[in-house]
């Protein structure tokens, strides 16, 4: 597993990928308020390249609907090809059904900031083991 790669400010680094600008901004702000260093982008073919350019403790991929499962899976696979040891988690609502081997974690957050932070903390804790 990838070692913890805290930023120069001592905070854990998260790379967040979302398909909706407003959700991306809200989740980024919640994570920053809880002490994480966050860089984010909208879904794009360059997301895996961005992950490879810098060490991240966790990559979060938003999966807002069943429609997004395949693109999230493909992005996860791309990231793991470029950075095999990268810890990846999908952030989903409770209606999204995911059966996949790629993400290391599935965080069920709905629109609950506490569940998001708790899921990220748990995923990062498993990453350090």
Regions found by a protein language model. Give the residues of each.
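A generic structural motif
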Residues: 34-38
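Conserved phosphotransfer cores of two-component systems
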Residues: 52-54, 78-86
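Acidic, metal-coordinating helix/loop segments flanking the phosphotransfer/catalytic sites
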Residues: 42-58
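Conserved phosphotransfer microenvironments
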Residues: 60-81
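Alpha4 helix (beta4-alpha4-beta5 surface) of REC/receiver domains from two-component response regulators
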Residues: 74, 90-109, 113-114, 118
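Non-catalytic signal-transmission and effector/linker regions of two-component phosphorelay proteins
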Residues: 1-24, 28, 112-129
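Short acidic, S/G/P-rich loop/turn micro-motifs used as interaction or catalytic elements
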Residues: 20-23, 64-68, 95-96, 113
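Alpha-helical interaction/dimerization surfaces of two-component signaling modules
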Residues: 29-31, 50
